[in-house]
Amino acid sequence: MQTTAEKTVLITGANVGLGKDIARQLASRPETARIYLACRNQDRATAAKADLEAKAGRPIFDIVLMDVSDPGSVRAGLAGVDGSIDAVVMNAGGMGGKTPMALTADGATYMFAQNVLGHVVLLETLLAEERLGEVAVFAGSEAARGIPKMGFKRPSFDSNSADELATVIDGSYFARGKPDVNLAYGQAKLIGILWMAYLARQYPDRRFISVSPGNTTGTQAPNDLALPLRIAAKYVMPRLGIAHMAGPRSSVHLL
C-alpha cells in the first residue's frame, strides 16, 4: 500500500451520500493522489467536485460520466480513464427507481443492472486489462440476508443453480406472482456478494471485499421505498441509524 501521494481510487455513485463522503474521507489521506468520481449526471458531478475540492483543499478529483445501469456507458466512461486504478469502490445502486423490474436493453431488470451488472462490466474490464492494482469494494446490504422487521425477506433459492440465479437477473423469478421489490433488491445484493467471492478465488493476489455500511443516514436509497418506509427513513431512522460519516468509514478503512 502506498505511503506517498500516488494512490488512485474510482468511486461509483460519488456525487451524493455514501459515495461522496467516501471521496471526502479519502481526500484527507496524504497518500491519495487522484479520485475519480463516477457519476451519471454532469451537473451534479460538477457540483460535487467543487464542494469536495473546497473541503479537501487540493484539486485531486476527476469526473467520469458513467451510468452503472448501462454497460455501454460504463465501458465508455472507463475508456476515458488512463492507466491503472489502485482501488475501486462500487457504491452506486439502490432500489431501482420508479420501474425497478422493467428490463434494460441488455435484458436485465433495472434493479439488477443498477446494483450489479454495471459493476461487473466495470471491474471485469479492469481485471481483463490488468488495470486493477489492489482492491475492489462492493457496497452490500443487510437485505442480502434479510431484514424481516423492515419488510425485506431473506433471499432463498431452491437449487442455487446458475439458471435459477439468472431468473433474478431477468425478473422471471417473479413471473408467477407480484414482484417483491424489497426481495429483488436483497437478491441482487446477494448475487453481487457471491460474485465478489468468486473473484477473490480467481485473483488471490488482489482483495475483493463486500461490506454493508449498515443503517446509514443521508443516502438516497429510501427515495424509492413505499410511502410508510420513506416516512420512517426520513423522520425516524436518522435518530436510530449510523451517523452519515460513520457509514463510509467501513469502506475507507479497507482501501
Language-model segments: residues:
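A glycine/serine/threonine-rich, flexible loop-to-helix segment
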Residues: 152-155, 217-236
